[in-house]
Regions:
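A short beta-strand-turn-helix
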Residues: 59-82
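Extracellular/periplasmic catalytic domains that process cell-envelope and extracellular macromolecules
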Residues: 75-77, 109-111, 134, 156-160
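Thiol/disulfide oxidoreductase modules built on the thioredoxin-like
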Residues: 137, 146-189
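N-terminal targeting signals for export/organelle localization
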Residues: 2-66, 199-206
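Thiol-based oxidoreductase modules, predominantly thioredoxin-like and allied folds used
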Residues: 112-127, 137-147
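Conserved redox-active cysteine motifs that mediate thiol-disulfide chemistry
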Residues: 86-103
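Hydrophobic beta-strand anchors of alpha/beta hydrolase catalytic cores
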Residues: 82-84, 116, 164
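Short pre-active-site segment immediately N-terminal to redox-active cysteine/selenocysteine motifs
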Residues: 80-82, 86-90, 160
């Protein structure tokens, strides 16, 4: 009888021990709070750090070209260099320049650091579109009479066409003249701007 009582007591103790919850908790994420809260192994609340990454913002010129109602695509808002090309389908010298302009733009678009926008001097948008299509030009365009063209930083209406104005992202004029001559400088100007920016960052760290 004593052996049976002893065995019953041992079994009861084992059952009671099995029903006790472990001391350490399991990680839980609430998911409802923007910052986020989780539970560590000891059951304490631990706040998740918010990301400190800032979204890249458009430059002064980037914002301005973004307001244009362009055809043949949308201009980049984050280029380092912009070229305003004033040209028209009825202009002989403009037609002579267009094959080279279209070719150079392919390099610019592939690189991603420079953008070109046609400021078309045709009377109609259809005329300007056909002009671009004729030379398989992939850059965006807008008529010179369109809204907000006169507000483009660094832009001035040329007395004669074709004409190209190259500006940095803040609208400072880097070059102004015949398109082929201006476009031949785009990569050099981009590299100069990048070098100046890197030098400025180095000075700020000192």
């Amino acid at each position: 009888m004593k052996k049976i009582q002893t065995l019953a007591m041992v079994m009861g103790l084992m059952v009671a021990t099995a029903n006790v919850a472990p001391a350490q908790g399991i990680g839980i994420s609430t998911g409802g709070d923007e910052a986020g809260i989780s539970m560590d192994a000891g059951g304490k609340k631990k706040k998740k750090k918010k990301s400190s990454k800032k979204k890249a913002t458009a430059s002064k010129v980037g914002k301005a070209v973004g307001k244009l109602k362009t055809f043949n695509g949308k201009p980049s808002k984050k280029a380092l260099v912009y070229v305003y090309l004033q040209s028209a389908s009825w202009c002989g010298p403009c037609n002579q320049e267009m094959p080279e302009v279209a070719s150079v733009y392919q390099e610019m678009a592939k690189d991603g650091r420079a953008e070109l926008v046609l400021i078309g001097c045709d009377q109609t948008e259809d005329g300007a579109k056909k002009f671009l299509k004729q030379y398989k030009a992939k850059f965006p365009g807008v008529l010179s009479t369109a809204k907000n063209v006169d507000k483009l930083p660094g832009f001035t209406a040329a007395q004669g066409i074709p004409n190209a104005i190259m500006v940095d992202a803040e609208g400072n004029v880097l070059a102004n003249g015949f398109p082929s001559a201006v476009l031949s400088q785009w990569k050099q100007k981009v590299e100069e701007l990048e070098a100046a920016a890197a030098e400025g960052d180095a000075d700020n760290e000192e």
